């Protein structure tokens, strides 16, 4: 390696980090339950779905980050500047519902982990998750963006180790893994499961947030950029290159976790009943692979809940600021968004039911995040010389069409009682 290469790498390192925060959305408790269920029911059959999902996610998150870097604004802010007040309020309401639904699933997941590990009642588990997430948000809100990112990366490492540890006890079949890369189905139920996995690929709040994260990160690392500096060819090209590297590694790790969960279930839980809930999956892992592996899995689930709910609250703050031009203290937002989850936990609602309801709300929000992203990044008036080229435009719109169609399909199945 030459001295020049080393210097270039050192310059890129400070620019890495935002994608690892966004990647937490791809390993939240809802994803855990979906991938465990897929592996337990169908073995290695649907590995290819997760591989395709990860590729889709990389493209979507890159476009969000690119939009933020080129314009210096977040996706919500750009949309807010182009809408009349009634439109902005309506768009904010749907985005806020999506953010609340996301937070609901993540708080419940963290509370379940505390219940599995320590027997903590679900309501008090939700309170603890909320308090810890507020502590994490205090770090981010105190102008310590790099420290916040470091904590989230640390939690992502715990998630990875917690969810993949079981593979050392029950290694997957190499031939099964290779066979799972061939796109195919096994009956109509497997099509539904695949649609669930692929349809949940892109979380709306991660799309909104990534366009803001890159600018918060740059301001923290390098200081606020002037318009001329931001749009200088060398500076922006370096940022975009770092962003591609950041997204590749962050989402590769998230994809590895998701695929690993499916492989673990395929190797150790195939054919077992009751694995369609997080509690059932934990019980099956503990009984099949031993209590130590079950405990490590629950620790990974706890890290997943803590990290994802902190990131979700961060996203909600950016959505409100961009669309309504109101900067509510993030602690106040955290307390407000925590209330629905605590009410559901306190009422004794079945956690799996709550997760299903939250996923339906997320499905409604997907088109409102992805379609504007595609339109803006294809608009030369917005992106200038960094407008998506034709292959990227076609790829992006095809991915968006597939994801939106699958989410609408899942909403239909859920509302008609077929999902």
Each predicted region: which residue ranges?
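Membrane-interface "cap" regions at the ends of multi-pass membrane proteins
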Residues: 1-30, 86, 157, 193, ...
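Transmembrane alpha-helical segments of multi-pass small-molecule transport proteins
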Residues: 92-96, 117-139, 157-162, 327-343, ...
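Extracellular/periplasmic helix-exit of transmembrane alpha-helices
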Residues: 57-70, 214-218, 222-229, 252-280
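Loop-to-transmembrane helix boundary motifs in multi-pass membrane proteins
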Residues: 86-88, 123-126, 292-294, 298, ...
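Juxtamembrane transmembrane-helix boundary signature
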Residues: 22, 49-82, 91-97
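Flexible loop linkers connecting adjacent transmembrane helices
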Residues: 2, 34-39, 62-87, 139-146, ...
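Hydrophobic alpha-helical segments and their helix-loop junctions in multi-pass secondary transporters
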Residues: 156-182, 191-212, 373-381, 406-418
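Helix-loop-helix module between adjacent transmembrane segments
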Residues: 56-61, 86-106, 114-140, 199-200, ...
